[in-house]
């Protein structure tokens, strides 16, 4: 292919230099990736062979600025692998991932390059670098050491080989799970669908139609699975679907992940040992706000002690209602939890998620969320149809700062489709950085899987989907407000256990009447959401909160159990899992189910030895939001301080220093316990 036909290899000529999705074809990736690797290798050679003595500028900054083309291509390719993939893309990923992994390993294990970095690092006292420069030097040096640069001979070769294996296995893990999820469908009759709300019935009928079939079909995608477990009256069907979901990747087929996770855990442990750490968790936590596994266990155990009594009460109350309905010998099982919890929630609060949906029409919610950002930070959003998008469902917005200057591009991608992974996430198509005095602004995307509009009805969100929107939008603000010199430290490039603070703090607004009143209107009548309905949302927001907390703690304990190991694992995965999280489990365990084989966060995502960070960030966000509560939830001074001290700073300083500058104190679990009604 000629270079002038490949959009990656020439100027984009698009608004704000956004990715030219309309021009990119599958055949463009491979040549652009290969050229990107070649270019970066040439840039690295130029650094290594520079006859001048190593300096911060000619070595550290030169390395930071290398690989621009490769970055451009891998960003689009990596993001579309999640949002708009195909069999061809997945085949190409299998082909290119080992090459890309080898390429980055070649850089991080380049001895001459590291010698120059080390030479600069050893002069750091004389150099007296300040702020971001000092941080970049430390981060670069640590990054190389943590990538095996201090290793020699066989150890270095082993490290390289293990990393390549890891990249292949994580990809296989994710693809197995995606294929297993996509392969499941269950056709249901009208009778079997009793109890399910109208919105789900329409969605299941639409799924069948999309697959060219009659009737109704449910799948294991969240918008299909979650309401089914919550509302389906047929207990045996709930059990069947629960088992299908919770035994994914355990079956005797090509998508089984049992051996893969053993290899993943063992390889990560071996990598940590090579670098002189006793466990993989110790290696990971060195670059975390928590710093040690003791600190993680301390948090998980503090929360476990605080929430267990309340969680036991919650389960007893749900079981009591189930027995009232089904008879005294009824035993509550995991496939009953969502169903009877929903019944109890309705009884206690007379609040049905479905009666909220009409007030949360997607475009109104979007206006509300954008409006919140305008009110807090003065920023505005304007759709620009000239900006190319990768799918017709996607919209692109220009975001302007309060002084009218251009701040960022924001893409929104709201609905499920084939080729898009489940869940919700924020990502960047371009980071922010400052070069020669020019502030190059970011391109940020939020991707969800909200129920689609269906026959005659717009997309109506559940309350938890409104929370999800706020959450991902919080990450987007972190990306859009980035204001740092170096792209590798901008936006969400922060310690993992700090990255969820900007997202989770936004969720606090979902139960604030003042915020809901700004946008929640009935999509047919235009009626504002009634005050008593808002009060019910507030009252219900802590419903079964302790049980939910224990569930998160159990995932945190499971994660730590896998990654605090000091010896190779070749045991029974299910038995190990059961033991790891038993003190946080209240409902009976179910034979054959297994979480670990589908726990993407810790096996294939960035949360290995990091799942605790959701709770860590919850402690932070409750503590931080208590300042908004104290000063007024739309207080622009508090918002300006949050933007200045947290959102704009990225990873340029230790997060505890940033947090204390905003909050004036270290965080404590007190605000979270109070918010959850565990203490008064």
For the regions a language model picked out, list residue spans one by one.
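Intrinsically disordered or highly flexible coil/loop and linker segments, enriched in small
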Residues: 38, 42, 46-53, 69-86, ...
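Short, hydrophobic/amphipathic alpha-helical patches that form generic packing surfaces
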Residues: 68-79, 138, 142, 243, ...
């Amino acid at each position: 292919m000629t270079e002038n036909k490949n959009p990656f290899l020439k100027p984009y000529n698009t608004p704000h230099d956004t990715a030219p999705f309309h021009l990119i074809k599958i055949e463009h990736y491979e040549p652009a990736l290969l050229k990107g690797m070649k270019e970066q290798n040439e840039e690295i050679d130029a650094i290594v062979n520079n006859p001048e003595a190593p300096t911060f500028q000619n070595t550290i900054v030169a390395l930071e600025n290398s690989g621009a083309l490769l970055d451009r291509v891998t960003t689009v390719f990596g993001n579309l692998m999640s949002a708009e993939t195909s069999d061809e893309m997945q085949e190409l990923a299998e082909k290119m991932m080992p090459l890309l992994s080898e390429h980055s390993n070649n850089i991080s294990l380049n001895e001459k390059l590291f010698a120059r970095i080390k030479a600069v690092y050893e002069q750091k006292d004389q150099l007296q670098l300040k702020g971001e420069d000092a941080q970049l030097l430390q981060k670069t040096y640590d990054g190389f050491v943590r990538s095996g640069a201090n290793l020699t001979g066989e150890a270095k070769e082993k490290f390289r080989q293990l990393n390549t294996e890891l990249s292949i296995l994580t990809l296989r893990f994710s693809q197995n799970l995606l294929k297993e999820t996509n392969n499941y469908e269950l056709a249901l009759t009208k009778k079997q669908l009793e109890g399910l709300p109208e919105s789900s019935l329409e969605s299941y009928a639409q799924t069948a139609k999309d697959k060219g079939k009659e009737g109704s079909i449910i799948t294991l995608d969240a918008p299909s699975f979650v309401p089914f477990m919550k509302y389906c009256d047929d207990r045996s069907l709930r059990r069947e679907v629960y088992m299908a979901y919770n035994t994914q990747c355990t079956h005797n087929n090509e998508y089984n992940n049992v051996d893969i996770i053993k290899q993943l855990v063992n390889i990560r442990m071996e990598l940590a040992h090579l670098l002189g750490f006793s466990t993989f968790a110790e290696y990971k936590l060195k670059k975390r706000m928590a710093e040690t596994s003791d600190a993680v266990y301390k948090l998980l155990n503090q929360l476990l002690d605080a929430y267990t009594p309340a969680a036991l009460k919650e389960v007893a109350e749900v079981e009591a209602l189930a027995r009232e309905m089904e008879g005294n010998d009824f035993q509550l099982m995991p496939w009953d939890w969502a169903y009877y919890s929903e019944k109890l929630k309705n009884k206690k609060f007379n609040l049905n998620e479905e009666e909220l949906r009409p007030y949360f029409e997607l475009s109104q919610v979007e206006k509300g969320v954008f409006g919140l950002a305008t009110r807090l930070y003065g920023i505005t959003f304007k759709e620009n149809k000239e900006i190319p998008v990768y799918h017709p469902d996607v919209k692109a917005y220009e975001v302007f700062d309060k002084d009218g200057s251009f701040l960022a591009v924001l893409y929104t991608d709201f609905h499920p489709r084939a080729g898009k992974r489940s869940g919700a996430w924020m990502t960047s198509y371009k980071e922010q950085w400052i070069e020669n005095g020019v502030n190059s602004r970011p391109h940020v995307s939020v991707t969800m899987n909200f129920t689609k509009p269906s026959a005659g009805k717009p997309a109506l969100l559940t309350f938890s989907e409104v929370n999800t929107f706020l959450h991902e939008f919080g990450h987007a603000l972190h990306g859009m407000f980035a204001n740092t010199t170096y792209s590798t430290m901008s936006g969400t490039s922060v310690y993992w256990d700090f990255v969820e603070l900007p997202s989770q703090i936004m969720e606090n607004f979902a139960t604030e009447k003042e915020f809901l009143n700004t946008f929640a209107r009935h999509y047919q009548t235009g009626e504002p959401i009634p005050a008593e309905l808002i009060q019910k949302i507030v009252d219900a927001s802590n419903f079964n909160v302790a049980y939910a907390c224990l569930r998160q703690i159990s995932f945190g304990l499971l994660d730590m159990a896998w990654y605090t190991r000091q010896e190779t694992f070749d045991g029974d995965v299910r038995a190990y899992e059961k033991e790891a999280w038993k003190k946080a489990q209240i409902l009976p365990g179910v034979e054959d189910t297994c979480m670990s084989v589908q726990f993407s966060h810790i096996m294939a995502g960035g949360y290995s030895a990091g799942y605790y960070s959701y709770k860590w960030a919850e402690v932070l966000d409750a503590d931080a939001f208590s300042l908004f509560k104290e000063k007024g939830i739309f207080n622009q001074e508090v918002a300006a301080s949050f933007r200045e001290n947290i959102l704009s700073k990225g990873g340029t300083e230790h997060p505890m220093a940033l947090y204390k500058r905003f909050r004036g104190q270290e965080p404590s679990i007190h605000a979270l316990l109070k918010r959850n009604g565990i203490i008064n």
